């Protein structure tokens, strides 16, 4: 009851906001005559004047209507198109820090210009995060003429850019880039040794395009910077040979997709490792001495059992490239850590890359929550409204479409996989006979290629340049991670009369499939409309209903006709993996639609709840890690930016001395004079007189601390006098930053291991988080103590070599 009331209140609040936005949009439209005849120079001067008013303290809300109207006029002049009321409403929702749910084809790219131009006036920079570099470069180039007319600068961030180019792009008013690159630049900036080397200039406002991909699907994926550990290729190859020979009885997979050796598996692996000289009896894999070897065995087992070629990764040109499991896009440059990627390379017979360790890492969840204001756009958001609100504090506003949606959506659940295949072929043949273009959705690369093989077996040919030039009929194209370089070309032809395209979820994300083809004339477009528009065929339902909606959304854009139909079967993985119990009909070829809808929604709901709980759990862990990361980065930044390094070093040195004395000179026991003397000599490189009265257990430990501190202070003063304060502080600051980087890298790996260990304990969620927080804090205290001691030791030893 309470939940229903809360949802009703939320729905009422959304309706009220939409009413307000519609009224504001009407006022913005009414300003059009005032701006239509303005000379370009006056348009730019108006924006410059508004920028000055913002810097003087005026709120953006007070000028948003005029800025939106000016940007709308700039769009008309630069692109010969201007934002319609639905796009203005979407931009108003974005300005208020919401997720704007705008259906596919409603013009999110143009909508973004309104809110980006407004927030650019703060002078703090606007970041537009896209799912891939193609969209970043396309959108920046496409919208640049609009921003130019307003006197606003536009930059773009791509993976191959050097620091100077990145810095220049970040200095622009509006910066487009891949979401991951913004996160990587944040991590890299926090490892720079001077403020002048950093590239970003703050986190004021971020607009996340395709927000569901970045803020939901990839939210918990760590963005990590790696450093080399060394070459262990022969070890990976040897262990791979052992694991490749295992039988299913040697391992087991639990419901959470974790794999472990059985007792028979341990015996088999140990025997083979002994034969290869990698393990010596009586030592077993359970012994502490075998921890590293066991780690490599487990990673190889994961590579062989859990990761599948053409689903999780592809192999091309002798290298392994990971694939985004949700979009089907290749992720060049992304690598598994902790030896898993090397295990994959050994499995596939590729050249084994150098093993790496994590230098720094952050998740999208944590990174984007750093922005003072965050907003997002996507075609499918309502299903994840709770998650957007719980994790990011963002409400979802569904924006009405500019034109009515006339697409027809259907779903058929077949009793058998064979019946499903026959139905798909019938749909395809009928559409082909009408000249209707067809987009067939596949959940993975492997399934897309299986569909291609099925079509070829039924007389179809895969389209290439030769078949295209000959005008061969009954052809199809395949778009997946293996053919991503031809994505633009394939999408351009996907709406042509009779075109058939098999695609993974990467198809057309951020692009329109135009009826008739990319450069179609009115006659070809009319031909496709007469045939029914684009037909989308889903070959199974996805684990998440949102992914189904994204596929359906390829058809029926901007009021175009279209149809989508999902053909699934009781044998499909999305049903069997959800453990949905279904009674198979004895004779019926399909399941009644009411029953089918219930089954499909129940299966998807189970997957969605599991995924949400997993991401929420990871966020709770990551929030604890983030507190430590913030403390470390704040400390490092204060050293880098020249805050009083000497004062900090003195405080750390005094705390180190206090730690040593507390360890060896406890009030409740006789003092360990020999141990204290050794520790002082080891850490401080000093010989301090601790003879009586300080050798007396009843003596004042504070007086002893004062003597040690005074001796250390004189030693440091002597170094400063001989080296010069500027040189000493510069060397000491760099040493301190290098120490922070080293210790934080090790701490990050310890926290990752701790997360996994606690996960293996299978505790209730609240207990797991509580244990992680307790143990993580103990690890952090130890890291800070190590930092104090190491800084002190280096400071006491630092000097300039004679030339």
From Swiss-Prot:
One of its GO terms (molecular function) is protein-exporting ATPase activity. It is a peripheral membrane protein. The keyword ATP-binding applies. InterPro entries: Helicase_ATP-bd, P-loop_NTPase, SecA, SecA_DEAD, SecA_motor_DEAD, SecA_preprotein_X-link_dom, SecA_SF2_C, SecA_Wing/Scaffold. The keyword Kinase does not apply. SMART domains: SecA_DEAD, SecA_PP_bind. It catalyses: ATP + H2O + cellular proteinSide 1 = ADP + phosphate + cellular proteinSide 2. CDD domains: DEXDc_SecA, SF2_C_secA. Disulfide bonds: none annotated. GO terms for biological process: intracellular protein transmembrane transport; protein import; protein targeting; protein transport by the Sec complex. Its EC number is 7.4.2.8. ATP binds at residues 87, 105-109, 512. It is an enzyme of class 7 (translocase). Its main location: membrane. Keywords: ATP-binding, Cell inner membrane, Cell membrane, Cytoplasm, Membrane, Nucleotide-binding, Protein transport, Translocase, Translocation, Transport. Gene3D superfamilies: Helical scaffold and wing domains of SecA, P-loop containing nucleotide triphosphate hydrolases, SecA, preprotein cross-linking domain. It is found in: Cell inner membrane; Cytoplasm. It comes from the Bacteria. Monomer and homodimer. Part of the essential Sec protein translocation apparatus which comprises SecA, SecYEG and auxiliary proteins SecDF-YajC and YidC. HAMAP family: SecA. Part of the Sec protein translocase complex. Interacts with the SecYEG preprotein conducting channel. Has a central role in coupling the hydrolysis of ATP to the transfer of proteins into and across the cell membrane, serving both as a receptor for the preprotein-SecB complex and as an ATP-driven molecular motor driving the stepwise translocation of polypeptide chains across the membrane. This is Protein translocase subunit SecA 2. It comes from Nitrobacter hamburgensis (strain DSM 10229 / NCIMB 13809 / X14). The gene is secA2.
